[in-house]
Amino acid sequence: MHISIAAVGKLKEKYLIAGVQEYTKRLSAYAKIEIIEVADEKTPERASELEEEQIKQREGERLLAKIPHDAHVIALAIEGKMKSSEQFAARLDELATYGKSKVVFVIGGSLGLSKQVMARADEALSFSKMTFPHQLMRLILLEQIYRAFRINRGEPYHK
């Protein structure tokens, strides 16, 4: 399975970079992992709704340009479906079973994902009704993917 995480913005915090590197290394035993970063847009302090939509659209165009046409796309969005770790593991296993060898998780910038990205997504996933920093979301997602592989293989880790 080839799993990509397409995200807006570069990681800046050393602890996040170290965490992403650690889970990417751990996951290499289970799948090919790729992190795709696209440039984020500066959001003016008092941006209008129109300006925010235009920013999301520009970031979305960059994301869409990096997504293979044959990939199964999972958008991380607050309005997505929430799953337990076990349900998430079962979903990844199901995708692999049905030949979805390319899975792309998409993480938007601070304003979220554009309508175009959401339209391209095959499904939307939410980790919580709470809002998380988009940079931290990468690390949380990688940990849950790692946990899912461990669950699916019956390996110790998940408690």
Swiss-Prot record:
It is an enzyme of class 2 (transferase). Its main location: cytoplasm. S-adenosyl-L-methionine binds at residues 76, 108, 127-132. It is found in: Cytoplasm. Keywords: Cytoplasm, Methyltransferase, rRNA processing, S-adenosyl-L-methionine, Transferase. GO terms for cellular component: cytoplasm. InterPro entries: Alpha/beta_knot_MTases, RlmH-like, tRNA_m1G_MTases_N. It catalyses: pseudouridine(1915) in 23S rRNA + S-adenosyl-L-methionine = N(3)-methylpseudouridine(1915) in 23S rRNA + S-adenosyl-L-homocysteine + H(+). Transmembrane segments: none annotated. One of its GO terms (molecular function) is rRNA (pseudouridine-N3-)-methyltransferase activity. Signal peptide: none annotated. It holds the Pfam family SPOUT_MTase. Its EC number is 2.1.1.177. Homodimer. Belongs to the RNA methyltransferase RlmH family. Specifically methylates the pseudouridine at position 1915 (m3Psi1915) in 23S rRNA. This is Ribosomal RNA large subunit methyltransferase H. The gene is rlmH.
